[in-house]
Regions:
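Residue(s) in the substrate-gating loop at a strand-loop-helix junction
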Residues: 143
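The beta1-alpha1 cofactor-binding region of Rossmann-like NAD(H)/NADP(H)-dependent oxidoreductases
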Residues: 39, 59-71, 103
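C-terminal helical subdomain
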Residues: 183-184, 203-248
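Active-site helix of classical SDR
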Residues: 121, 159
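Conserved glycine-rich Rossmann-like NAD(P)H-binding loop of the short-chain dehydrogenase/reductase
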Residues: 29-43
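Substrate-binding pocket helix/loop in short-chain dehydrogenase/reductase
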Residues: 96-98, 105-107
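Conserved glycine-rich cofactor-binding loop
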Residues: 13-15
């Protein structure tokens, strides 16, 4: 059991974020939740509280530095410290030809996937440095696309490759302050975003094919495992994917 450990999960109203928040609550963590939509966050908070754990719902656009600063101030007032950040909030762009992407579509993905991860990590690092005892852990949600792209996915793929660089930089810079940072790269979790895998998605050879998926609860369990290690140990990179999905040899 985590005991008096405090976690923050972004994008916690749905999908992977919700699954991670619930898994952490079951493991004894007190969990703060960030997301843009109040009602899904409140629903996740109620489920965590039903487990006997404390939950704090904070409506916030992770791409807005003012909103992120306010969310971290509220978290510090309520919890007093932060032991884990799961940087999960993410967005994608339409699967259209590269030259047809608008700047607005590009920027919307960068704002959430990269800028949002940066801002939340920055807030977490600052708090982890000054709290007593100091230190904590950051887990960034990368993706299979941090290694190999899907067709017609340049904004998403670019941001997820960038997350790998962000993860390694935080892991290096955080060492002296007992801050560990790792990344989980997930392939085909069955969420609202991942449901399209069951209907058929473009492949590198031009085909449309159904792909295997994994239960999103398994991702939550993986986050709990990464979070349960002592700060002297770090899973820098974990890949969790459907065994039979096309990744190795994706093309």
């Amino acid at each position: 059991m985590a005991g008096d450990k405090f976690a923050l999960v972004t994008g916690a109203g749905r999908g992977i974020g919700r699954a991670a928040a619930l898994a952490l609550g079951k493991a004894g963590w007190r969990v703060a939740l960030i997301g843009r939509s109040a009602e899904p966050l409140a629903a996740t908070a109620r489920e965590i509280e039903a487990l006997g754990q404390r939950a704090l719902a904070l409506t916030c656009d992770v791409g807005d530095p003012v909103a992120v600063n306010a969310a971290f101030a509220a978290l510090e007032r309520e919890f007093g410290r932060l032991d884990l950040l799961f940087n999960n909030a993410g967005a994608g762009a339409p699967a259209i030809p590269f030259e047809e992407l608008t700047f607005a579509q590009w920027k919307a993905v960068v704002d959430v996937n990269l800028t949002g991860a940066f801002l939340c990590a920055q807030g977490a690092v600052a708090l982890m440095k000054r709290q007593n005892p100091r230190g904590g852990r950051i887990i960034n949600n990368g993706s299979i696309s941090a290694h190999a792209p899907r067709p017609l996915s340049a904004p998403y793929t670019a941001t997820k490759h960038a997350i790998t660089g962000l993860t390694k930089s935080i892991a290096l810079d955080g060492r002296a302050f007992d801050i560990a940072c790792g990344q989980i790269d997930i392939g085909n979790a069955l969420t609202d975003m991942g449901f399209k895998m069951t209907q058929g998605v473009p492949q590198a050879d031009g085909r449309i094919a159904v792909e295997p998926t994994i239960d999103v609860a398994e991702v939550g369990e993986a986050i709990v495992h990464m979070a349960s290690l002592p700060l002297s140990s770090n899973i820098l990179s974990m890949t969790l994917m459907a065994t039979k999905m096309p990744f190795v040899g994706r093309g």
